[in-house]
Every structure is written in C-alpha cells, then in structure tokens.
Amino acid sequence: MGTRRYIASKVLQALLTLAFVMVFNFFLFRVIPGDPAALLLRGTAAFNPQNVAEVTKELGLDKPLPQQFLVYAQDTLTLNFGDSFFLKGQDVKTVIGERIGPTMLLVATSTIASAALGLIIGIYAGWRRGSRFDVGSQGFTLFVYSMPEFWFGILVLMAFAGGIGPFPSLFPAGGYSTPGADLSGFGHVSDVLNHLALPWFVLVVAYMGEYSLIMRNSLIDVMNDDFVMTARAKGVREKQILWRHVVPNALLPTFTVVLLSLGFIFGGAITVEYVFSYPGLGLLTVQAIDSKDFPLLQGLFLLFSAAVIIANLIADILYSRLDPRVRAG
C-alpha cells in the first residue's frame, strides 16, 4: 500500500471514529437522569414549572429527537456547545479555552519527562537483563505503574505541602499561580512552575513505569534477533550494537505508546488536577460532573475523545514512516 493511500485510509478511519463519538456524545447526555432545564434554574427565584417549560423550549429539548440531533451536529461542527450551567452566562468554548493552557502545560511537560526517564531506565534494564539494576528497576517501575495517581498525589501533597510531612511547606498546596500576586516576567514563570511541580512530579512518576517496562521488553526482543548475533560475531563493540542497532529498532513500540498516551494522560490529569486543585480541564471536568453541567460535559467529552483519536492517527502515520512494513501489512 502506498504512503498516500495508507494515510488517507487512516484519516478516514479517524473521521469515522470521531463521527461515532459525536453520535454517542449526543445520546449519552440524553439518557442520563435529570432535566437540563430544571438543573439550570434550580436554586434561583425563577425555578417554577412555567419557567422550566420555557427554558426547555429555548434549549430545543421539546423538539423531536432527529431534529435535536441535526441542531446538535451543526452546533458541534461550528464549536458552539452552548452556555455552561455551572459557570452561568459563559460560553462552553470560552471556558474550555481558558482551562486548556494549564492542562497542556502539565500534560506535555510531564509526558516528555516521563518518556525520557522511562526510556533510559528501560534501555539499561533490558541491556543488563538479570542484573541488580534490572531487578531493582523492574520492582520500582511495576510499583509506580500499578499505583493510582490520586493516591500517590495525596501522599505527595501531604509530604510536601500538607503541613505534616518532612517538607510541609516546600511547595504550594494547589492552584496555578499565587492569587493576588502582581508578578511578571521571570517572577511569574517561577510562580507557575512552583505550582506545577507537584502535579507534574506525580504524572511523571506514574507514567514513567509504563514506558520503562515497554522499552525493556522491546529491547530484549530485539536483542534476540539474528542481526545482533551477526554484529557480535563480526566483533562490533557492545555499545555500538546497543545504540546503533538495538535501540533504534526497540524504540518503535515505545514511541507508539508514548504518542497514544498523550490522549489518555488527560484521564490521569483529571484525578491529579482534582487532588492539587490545579485549574485545568481535569478539575473543570470534576466540577462539571458535580453540577451536572451537560453542555460543558459534552464539550469536554468530545475534546478528550478527539485528543485520543488524533494522537492515534499521528502515531499510525509516524510509525508507518519509521517502519515501512506497516504500510505493506
């Protein structure tokens, strides 16, 4: 299969998957118990049956389901998700846009750091299979890989910002920056990084184990290939075999997992942001669930799904460029 045809097929699959997600997103929030109009007016002086009926009509919920879907599809394609119930009067697109920056900073930097550390540990553990370093690193990475992010986050919060650990006030307990602080330039950057440190550390440790284990197993598989034995028989130095022949071939599976995890890390970021009160999309998701903010939840669900689909698409395309055998299959 040619490169263009392969990419076109993957793009088509991604678009079909995204279309399915849009349909699922529409029906999901219509089978959840609760009347959106009543939720919007609850707690206000205007909460009465007449006003609920009027709001139901304004939201278009009194129309037949096929007509509702057509309106929903048109609004979704134009990124019009309506107004938030939780943040009254604010457009969902604007709310998400304000929160996406902190989450992208957290997810992008933690992914790069965890991938780098995981690859290094996995390479040396696989190359020295059976050594003390291999056994010790496997135990550590398996532990952090199986550890829930929220539980580890609570421990880190207690140790470094909760007032009861060995370093009770080393870092802020939460937030994105110091409230009311008039900072600019390096002072602002330093303040943001100080608040980022603890949630960043939790995500790095949580995902480093996965990358390390995959890299180690992939490296061991490549070491059993015939070309490695041939290189050794020719007298090629061990370091040269490792870095020029084994590592490049072993990187492909790990590379794919790292790209795919860019989408799934948003899931881990939800719990971590909630623990540290970090004002990103994760904390916003929890707040939207608590308040049953259907328009906001629809926008967030679509965004998270699109992130996974796009990451999967990029991984498929780049993998096919690195390994042409994928296109042939």
Annotate the PLM regions:
Residues G2-Y6, I100-F133, P179-G329:
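Alpha-helical transmembrane segments of integral membrane proteins
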Residues T3, V11, N51, V55, ...:
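Hydrophobic alpha-helical segments of integral membrane proteins
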Residues A14, R99, T103, G139-L142, ...:
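Residue-level signal for discrete positions within transmembrane alpha-helices
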Residues L18-L70, F160-V189:
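Hydrophobic alpha-helical transmembrane segments of membrane transport/permease proteins
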Residues V21, N25-F29, G153, L157, ...:
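Juxtamembrane/transmembrane-helix interface segments of polytopic membrane transporters
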Residues I32, V144-M147, F266:
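Transmembrane helix irregularities
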Residues L61-L119:
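An internal, D/E-rich "acidic patch" concept
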Residues G139-Y207:
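Membrane-water interface segments at transmembrane-helix boundaries in multipass membrane proteins
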